[in-house]
Swiss-Prot record:
This is Large ribosomal subunit protein bL9. Belongs to the bacterial ribosomal protein bL9 family. Keywords: Ribonucleoprotein, Ribosomal protein, RNA-binding, rRNA-binding. HAMAP family: Ribosomal_bL9 (MF_00503). One of its GO terms (molecular function) is structural constituent of ribosome. NCBIfam families: L9. It comes from Bordetella avium (strain 197N). One of its GO terms (cellular component) is ribosome.
């Protein structure tokens, strides 16, 4: 299926590009998330009429993400989780836990889908570098310090 991208999508393209994607990806992700529209003649004409407005919205989103990224870059988040004597956690620290911790620390707008854990969930006590993708162009490094709670 061919779609018109309404915003920059990682590993796919930029605003206004007509790209070919799998039908399921378009129907289940891109179109419902308002990241793309089906590429028909009418949709292309409508897009060209709204192009300036969409580019302005994209620039505002990028500026907001960069401002949040400057505040968030190098931040150290402390997460307390129950742990055994050997330093292994009972349970794990997920990207949802990290996003929640960042939101409570005052970084509004961080979603769990933006938190990238390179080695999967955190299952031990320690310090772990992670990345937060606030925008397709804004990637921020954050350190998560997992502390063990003893009963």
């Amino acid at each position: 299926m061919q779609v018109i991208l309404l915003e920059k999508v990682s590993n796919l393209g930029n605003l206004g590009e007509v790209v070919r994607v799998r039908d399921g990806y378009a129907r289940n992700f891109l179109i419902p998330q308002k990241k793309a529209r089906r590429a028909t003649d009418a949709a292309l004409k409508e897009f060209e009429a709204r192009r300036v407005e969409l580019e302005k919205i994209q620039a505002e989103k990028l500026a907001a993400a960069q401002a949040l990224g400057e505040r968030l870059n190098g931040y150290q988040l402390k997460v307390a989780q129950k742990a055994g004597v050997d330093g292994r956690l009972f349970g794990s620290v997920t990207n949802a836990d990290i996003a929640e911790g960042l939101r409570t620390a005052g970084f509004e707008g961080v979603e769990k889908s933006q938190v990238r854990l390179p080695n999967g969930q955190l299952k031990t006590v320690g310090e772990f570098p992670i990345q937060v993708g606030l925008h397709a162009d804004v990637l921020v490094d954050v350190t998560v310090l997992v502390e063990g709670e003893m009963n």
